[in-house]
From Swiss-Prot:
Any GO molecular function: NAD binding
Origin species: Saccharophagus degradans (strain 2-40 / ATCC 43961 / DSM 17024)
Tagged with keyword NADP: yes
Pfam families per record: DapB_C, DapB_N
Stated name of the protein: 4-hydroxy-tetrahydrodipicolinate reductase
Cellular component GO terms held in the UniProt record: cytosol
CDD domains, per database record: DHDPR_N
UniProt-listed InterPro entries: DapB_C (IPR022663), DapB_N (IPR000846), DapB_N_CS (IPR022664), DHDPR_bac (IPR023940), NAD(P)-bd_dom_sf (IPR036291)
Length: 268
């Protein structure tokens, strides 16, 4: 079965990568491409915009006008746009793949209320390698976590607007859950001045922004006499995009609820 996929944020860096990944897939075709309401790109061919050649899919600025043209929506946009798109998908019973990060508590609640009524895969990162890292972090934290100082480092391009990255925060959640801690209570986001000695129970986060870094993440388990580091470095957004397309084809005919990439990859 070939899955028809709609891509929101089609004019952005990730949107173009998603269109490219859909066009490369043997299991999916591009059904629709959506841009912001005020975009000047309405009517342009989505494939030509993404640099993959004419696809016969005209860009639109209203998701509700193309609901008949796709089976699954892939959404990597902004929290407010994703909340609105989830409402449309709920109304038309359309599965969603969502990689948007930076939700406020209210936005997250509104999104999840609608997303849980249709098959939805939500992940901070859709690359196979990062999701394997999540599994490795869980194992490492269970073995070493109570004897190690844990630090999460992440770096991204200068245009990224949220920090720490959604992937870094998800890593923190995995680590905290593995050692039975509440991340909200133990997370330390940056340090400055006279901080005092480090609390062993804390999980530190360090953020770097600059250049065109696609995404680097390292978790360091620092013990007396040894240090274990688990690192993932992305060199292309296509690794994320291909994972999102894989999730989209997997979602078809699944039960309505919220899944994550660990479900897609069978890592649970």
């Amino acid at each position: 079965m070939t899955t028809r996929i709609a891509v929101t944020g089609a004019a952005g860096r990730m949107g173009k990568a998603l269109i490219e990944a859909v066009c490369q897939s043997e299991d999916a075709v591009l059904g629709a491409a959506i841009v912001a309401p005020d975009s000047s790109l309405v009517g342009a061919d989505a494939g030509e915009l993404a640099g993959v050649g004419k696809q016969g899919v005209a860009i639109v600025n209203d998701l509700s006008t193309v609901v008949a043209d796709f089976d699954v929506l892939i959404d990597f946009t902004s929290p407010s746009a994703t909340v609105a798109n989830a409402s449309v998908c709920k109304a038309h019973n359309k599965p969603m793949v969502v990689g948007t990060t930076g939700f406020s508590p209210a936005e997250k609640a509104a999104f999840e209320a609608d997303a849980s009524t249709v098959p939805t895969c939500v992940a901070s990162n859709f690359s196979t390698g990062v999701n394997l890292c999540f599994k490795l972090l869980d194992i490492a934290a269970r073995v070493m976590g109570n004897d190690a100082d844990i630090e999460v480092y992440e770096a991204h391009h200068r245009h990224k607007v949220d920090a720490p990255s959604g992937t870094a925060l998800r890593m923190g959640e995995v680590l905290a859950n593995a050692v039975n801690r509440d991340l909200n209570e133990v997370a330390v986001y940056g340090r400055e001045g006279q901080t005092g000695a480090r609390d062993r129970n804390t999980i530190g986060f360090a953020t770097v922004r600059g250049g065109d870094v696609v995404g680097d993440h390292t978790v360091s388990f620092m013990c007396e006499g040894e240090r274990v580091e688990i690192t993932h470095k992305a060199s292309s957004r296509l690794s994320f995009a291909r994972g999102a397309v894989r999730a989209a084809t997997w979602l078809v005919e699944k039960e309505p609820k919220i899944y994550d990439m660990q479900d897609v990859l069978g890592l649970k």
